[in-house]
């Protein structure tokens, strides 16, 4: 099917209106509608580009140019003390929540902040994201942060038992990593509402990820030698609280901030 050029379309419209002048008002209305749609489309693209530009200029003026010593240091190397696993959810950026500065934390974000068990044949992206900061950068702390209203956990809790993932290409397969958390919550919290079950699963899924971290030899070795600490956390952006706990698989926080 051939595509008519802009010039040909305008020419054909002109010829039609010259023959049928009574269509003038109809054509004017359609042209106005098309013009409005094109202007809106162009405006949306412009807004996105301008947001990116203005965001960088703000960063450069208020951060980069005011901290030459820091950026000269970062240009040479990085020595982060934290490796953080956090959700890709746009509401839970760990750098904002914990006020991490550039160079302070190596951050890995994915759906529902999950860490799969050690397996050389799959999830190599997570394995690489673990291996590099631990074996090369020698981070001293791993923190896995769950959060309130997590869509990944809600999706996990909603999957019917003993059924294969069918609705999505990647998501359902990924969130099954923390199926043990779902199973435990379904058993231990069966009398709670679905919403409360999800809240509990947000925390229990963190514990599953903490356990999975120990399946990586280079993680386990450093934990045993007290060279690496592993902690779980839960950020509630509805209540404005942050719970932190040690690697004892208890959801009772070591301390809570509010």
From Swiss-Prot:
Coiled-coil parts of chain: 24-54
Signal peptide: 1-28
GO molecular function: carbonate dehydratase activity; zinc ion binding
InterPro entries membership: Beta_CA_cladeB, Carbonic_anhydrase, Carbonic_anhydrase_CS, Carbonic_anhydrase_sf
Modified residues (Phosphothreonine): 35
Segments passing through the bilayer: none
One Pfam family from the record: Pro_CA
Keywords linked to the UniProt accession: Coiled coil, Cytoplasm, Lyase, Phosphoprotein, S-nitrosylation, Signal, Zinc
Organs and tissues of expression: Strongly expressed in aerial tissues including leaves, stems, flowers and siliques, and, to a lower extent, in roots.
GO CC term, one of those recorded: cytosol
Positions bearing Phosphoserine: 95
Enzyme class name: lyase
Catalytic activity: hydrogencarbonate + H(+) = CO2 + H2O
Subcellular localization: Cytoplasm, Cytosol
GO biological process: carbon utilization
PTM-bearing positions, type S-nitrosocysteine: 201
E.C. number: 4.2.1.1
Keyword Zinc included in the entry's annotation: yes
The keyword Transport is assigned to this record: no
Biological role: Reversible hydration of carbon dioxide.
Family, as annotated: Belongs to the beta-class carbonic anhydrase family.
Protein name in the entry: Beta carbonic anhydrase 3
Organism: Arabidopsis thaliana (Mouse-ear cress)
Gene name linked to the record: BCA3
């Amino acid at each position: 099917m051939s595509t008519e050029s802009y010039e040909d379309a305008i020419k054909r419209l002109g010829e039609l209106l010259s023959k049928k002048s009574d269509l003038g008002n109809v054509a004017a209305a359609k042209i106005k509608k098309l013009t409005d749609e094109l202007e809106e489309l162009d405006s949306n693209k412009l807004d996105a580009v301008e947001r990116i530009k203005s965001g960088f200029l703000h960063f450069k003026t208020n951060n980069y140019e005011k901290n030459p010593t820091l950026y000269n240091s970062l240009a040479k190397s990085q020595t982060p003390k934290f490796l953080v696993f956090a959700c890709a959810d746009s509401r839970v950026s760990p750098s904002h929540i914990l006020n991490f500065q550039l160079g302070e934390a190596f951050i890995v974000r994915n759906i529902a902040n999950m860490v799969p068990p050690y397996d050389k044949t799959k999830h190599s992206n997570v394995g690489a994201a673990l291996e590099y900061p631990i074996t090369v950068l020698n981070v001293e702390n791993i923190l896995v942060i769950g959060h309130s209203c997590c869509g990944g956990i809600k999706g996990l809790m909603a999957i019917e038992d003993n059924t294969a993932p069918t609705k999505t290409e990647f998501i359902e397969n990924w969130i099954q990593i923390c199926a043990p958390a779902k199973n435990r919550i379904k058993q231990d919290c069966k009398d709670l509402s679905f919403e409360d079950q999800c809240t509990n699963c947000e925390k229990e899924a963190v514990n599953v990820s903490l356990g999975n971290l120990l399946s990586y030899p280079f993680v386990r070795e450093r934990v045993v030698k007290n060279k690496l600490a592993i902690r779980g956390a839960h950020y509630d952006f509805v209540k404005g609280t942050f719970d932190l706990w040690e690697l004892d698989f208890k959801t009772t926080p070591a301390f809570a901030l509010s």
